[in-house]
């Protein structure tokens, strides 16, 4: 695997072949991340200090786009440089929005105001039309929080970045079947902490109270209630937001971590059908994280999964 970094002035600096690397892609809840290591000449090291954008290429295909957060050089007979950073979501996370209130706001307006100005031009939105009659943006929240919050409000999929840097607002379409013979290891986890089973929304304008419960989560023996207040006549939006908050809080209730040899071809949000009798995991899961790693000797792929809703 090789890569290159770009400077603010447009200079493209090719990098030597990586001696070790780790690429992590997520479903958009957090930023993707990378760490690569390679031998360096002293003249290249000086140029690398100006690099801000990072691209990794494997087999002729772009497998990661991101920003360089940190560079480290070690000298012992020769220079070895380590670059690490985040995916393109970092551009949205590092820029805050001013306070604003919108009426009849649609997805394209959100992208024009909070996404495209930060150099993110490749965008694919599926479904919709995604719009809401009223939304407030608190001052000081990040542009990523604005985009994520709008998508939750209107019921759009969670935004995420493809390996080639495309911002995708769409549901996963890939499907995979995995069994014990495909894995090096598997870890199952049940975590009830933070799970919400009931969300009440109090409308300050009408005095109405909407209650949303999840009987499936209650069957786990969990009793956890949250309150929220809203104003305005959009009760259906409040209830939809309540369901979204319950679903978001339950994301980590039932999770799996699978490790496989080599590089496994998959995308975050793809569906995985598992057959792991030893862990009593014989159902559908959704990929939330993909970590490809090469330690200098062998390559492995780790998949983070959550139970499919």
Kindly label every feature range from the protein language model:
Residues 1-96, 152-155, 160, 173-189:
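Assembly/oligomerization scaffold segments
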Residues 25-42, 79-90, 201, 252-260, ...:
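Oligomerization/assembly interface segments of phage tail-like spikes and tubes
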């Amino acid at each position: 695997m090789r890569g290159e970094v770009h400077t603010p002035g447009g200079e493209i600096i090719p990098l030597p072949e990586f001696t070790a690397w780790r690429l992590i892609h997520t479903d958009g809840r957090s930023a993707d991340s990378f760490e690569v290591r390679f031998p360096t000449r002293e003249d290249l090291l000086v140029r690398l200090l100006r690099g801000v954008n990072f691209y990794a290429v494997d087999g002729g295909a772009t497998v990661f786009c991101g920003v360089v957060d940190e560079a480290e050089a070690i000298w012992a007979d020769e220079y070895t440089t380590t670059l690490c950073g985040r995916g393109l979501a970092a551009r949205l996370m590092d820029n805050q929005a001013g306070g604003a209130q919108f009426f009849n706001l649609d997805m394209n307006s959100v992208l024009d105001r909070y996404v495209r100005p930060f150099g993110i031009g490749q965008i694919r939105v599926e479904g919709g039309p995604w719009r809401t009659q009223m939304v407030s943006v608190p001052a000081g929240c990040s542009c990523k929080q604005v985009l994520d919050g709008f998508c939750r409000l209107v019921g759009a999929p969670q935004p995420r970045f493809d390996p080639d840097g495309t911002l995708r607002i769409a549901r996963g379409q890939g499907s995979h079947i995995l069994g014990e013979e495909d894995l090096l290891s598997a870890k199952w986890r049940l975590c009830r902490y933070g799970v919400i089973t009931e969300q009440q929304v109090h409308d300050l304008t009408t005095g109405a109270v909407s209650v949303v419960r999840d009987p499936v989560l209650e069957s786990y023996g969990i009793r956890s209630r949250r309150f929220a207040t809203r104003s305005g006549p959009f009760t259906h939006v409040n209830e939809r937001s309540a369901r979204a908050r319950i679903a978001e809080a339950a994301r980590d209730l039932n999770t799996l971590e699978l490790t496989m040899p080599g590089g496994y071809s998959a995308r975050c949000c793809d569906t995985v059908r598992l057959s792991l009798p030893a862990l009593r995991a014989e159902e559908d899961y959704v990929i939330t994280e993909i970590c490809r790693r090469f330690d200098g000797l062998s390559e492995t792929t780790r998949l983070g999964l959550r139970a499919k809703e």
